[in-house]
Amino acid sequence: MAQKFFSAEWAKDALEVERAASDQIYKRFKNPAGFTHVLALEVADHPGVVTHIQYDQGRSVTWTTDLFDEDQVWARFSANLDAWRAAAEGKAKASNLVMAGRIKLTKGAMKDALENAAPFDRLVQTFGGVETNWEI
């Protein structure tokens, strides 16, 4: 059954898909063992639609709509729904959408985003592995 994009149910399914791709994502981090961070992902044209994914040493441990405290968020990416969908469906790389300004880095350093563009691309590609209801 299709889950609403970035809903709690969707995040649960997405974590399973991400974990299936975990080895591919891990090897793409600049420093996987040091990648212990929380990423915030939000839908700019649907305020309040936000998920957080937590990594510990380059491996996902939590993907949730129960948000972490802001001081724990290392990077925040915000995009309209159509940009997230384009990246999820393989029509565009997430990192290219960041460079084009369609996915905005609203917290964190662009240097870190660039250094970890490949794992971010693979992470967002995993969205396509979740049966998604894009009507949010």
Model-derived features: positions:
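Feature captures hydrophobic
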Residues: 1-136
